Structure formats: C-alpha cells, structure tokens
C-alpha cells in the first residue's frame, strides 16, 4: 500500500480572491429650498405703464402679484395705464387704483413752494408727460394748491369715480387718493381730502381710500372717519401707508407701525430685474392679493 509523502504540497496555487468592493453610497439629494413665507401680498407701482411684454414677464418671474393702476388725474395726466385693466387681469395681476389729486406743494418737505398755476417741475410720480403738459402755456392749470377746497375735492371725486367705472372696475372697488408727504395737514388740504372722500361716498359706486406717508396717516384717518360717519358708512377707509423703515416683502402691512394699514409702501424708486426686464419701482405689501378689490 502506498504511503503519501510528507512535506509541503507541490500543487500550484493562485492569488487569494479579493472581496467585491461595496458600491459608493449615492449622494444625498439636495435639501429643497424652503418656501418663502410671506405675511402679505407683494405689489409694485411705477409711473408709466411698462408695456404688456414687461408686465407678462414680471408676472411670471417676480414675487409681485399686484400693481398700482394710475388713473389720469389733476396732478398726473399720463394715460398709459388707461384701458389696461382687462389685459392685466388676464395675466393674473391684482390692482390698486390710484388718483393723484391736488397737493399742498408748499408743505411737501424739501420742496420750494410751486407756482400756483402750474404743476411742479419735479412731480413726485416721475411723470414727464404730465409735467410737460402742465408747463405748456396753452394748457389751463389743473394741479395747484389753490384748488385745495372741499368743493374741488367733491368735483374731483366724481372724476375719479367716472374714470374708475370707465376702466371696468367693479362696484365697491377702492380708489386710493394719493396724498403726498406734508410737514402738517393744513386746513385747506383737510378740506380737499374730506370733500373728495365725501364725494366718492356720495357717488356710491366705489370705496374711497387714502395713500399717504406714515407721519400724516393719523391726521388723515381722522378726516376719513369723520367723512364716513357723516355718511353713515361703517368701518374705515382703506389706508396705503408709505414708510421705508424696516421694510421687507415678507412683512405684513401692519409692520409699518399702524394697525389700520392695508398696504405698506416701503421701498422707493428701486431698479429691479426679473426675467431680464428691469423696471424702477416702488415696492409694497398688502393684506389682499388685489388691494382695490371690493371689501
């Protein structure tokens, strides 16, 4: 019987097999960008209508959901916004109707008193068309502190209501009377504002509101409340208040420091670019998606 030889095996052997490497873990998906939480509804205003293409681009790419809608008015005669309501509504824009009535130019901070028969050359709303028209010798004066009377306020309220109706805004829509910043609300300005509010209430089709600076808001609110009470109208006039302190688009309108503010304008004459289109705007936040919608 054969016996196996002692000693190391002579059978050749190859390298030991290596374990298959584990695949690298897939990278974690990026964390989703948290949605922007807003307490109000951002909107903007700008003096001249930017054009349909620009408005469509901004509606698709910007955070803004409503826009100021200027009526032709004594201190702002440009008509570029006229006839655009349906176009803007079709794009999804809300609106805030603005009427720039008579102003107490002598009381505007930093402004020299204007001639009584012409509109100031540096009109607040950047309206070169209105300035040129007002300065033309053949044009009768339309914007003058000489017209700060209750009777004129009532007459121009009728004008504002007629133009708002002609633009197709529904009954109950808010028309904001633009009252630019003053050092103090004079008796003449108070009379004009009271007459204008009373005139819109008497017309019955629309709701009078006020645009003003924060420092003038309380005085103008008292005037508005008195006019509402005299007509037996419950509630307050809507207020659109301007003040730049602490403003962001995420704020609610009451962040301006007034609990009755429905709109806060907090960024002025600022160039912004959305979708490749640059506009110079005033930025606002409102308590509704369309600040002139019937309340």
Where do the protein language model's features map onto the residues?
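Aromatic-lined carbohydrate-recognition surfaces of secreted/lumenal glycan-active proteins
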Residues: 201-222
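Functionally critical loop-and-helix segments that line ligand-binding/catalytic clefts
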Residues: 30-47, 55, 225-295
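Long, well-ordered alpha-helical scaffolding segments within enzyme catalytic domains
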Residues: 188-205
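N-terminal low-complexity, Pro/Thr-rich disordered segments
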Residues: 6-39, 115-116, 121-133, 137, ...
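Substrate-binding cleft of extracellular glycoside hydrolase catalytic domains
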Residues: 34-55, 60-65, 69-192
């Amino acid at each position: 019987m054969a016996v196996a030889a002692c000693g190391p095996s002579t059978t050749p052997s190859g390298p030991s097999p290596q374990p298959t490497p584990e695949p690298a873990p897939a990278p974690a998906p990026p964390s989703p960008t948290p949605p922007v939480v807003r307490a109000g509804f951002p909107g903007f205003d700008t003096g001249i209508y930017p054009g349909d293409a620009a408005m469509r681009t901004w509606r698709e790419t910007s955070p803004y959901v409503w826009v100021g809608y200027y009526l032709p008015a004594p201190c702002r005669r440009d008509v570029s916004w006229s006839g655009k309501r349906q176009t803007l509504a079709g794009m999804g824009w809300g609106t805030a109707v603005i009427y720039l009535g008579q102003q107490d130019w002598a009381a505007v901070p930093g402004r020299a008193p204007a001639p009584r028969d012409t509109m100031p050359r540096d009109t607040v709303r950047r309206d070169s068309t209105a300035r040129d028209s007002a300065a033309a010798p053949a044009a009768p004066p339309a914007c003058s502190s000489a017209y700060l009377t209750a009777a004129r306020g009532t007459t121009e309220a009728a004008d504002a209501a007629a133009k708002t109706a002609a633009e197709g805004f529904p009954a109950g829509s808010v028309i904001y009377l633009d009252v630019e910043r003053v050092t103090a609300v004079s008796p003449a300005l108070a009379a004009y504002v009271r007459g204008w509010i009373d005139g819109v209430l008497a017309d019955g089709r629309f709701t009078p509101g006020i645009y003003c600076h924060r420092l003038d808001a309380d005085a103008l609110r008292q005037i508005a409340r008195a006019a509402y009470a005299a007509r037996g109208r419950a509630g307050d006039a809507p207020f659109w208040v301007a003040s730049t302190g602490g403003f962001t688009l995420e704020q609610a309108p009451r962040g301006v420091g007034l609990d009755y503010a429905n709109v806060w304008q907090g960024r002025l004459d600022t160039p912004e670019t959305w979708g490749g289109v640059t506009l110079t705007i005033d930025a606002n936040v409102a308590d509704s998606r369309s600040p002139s919608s019937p309340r």
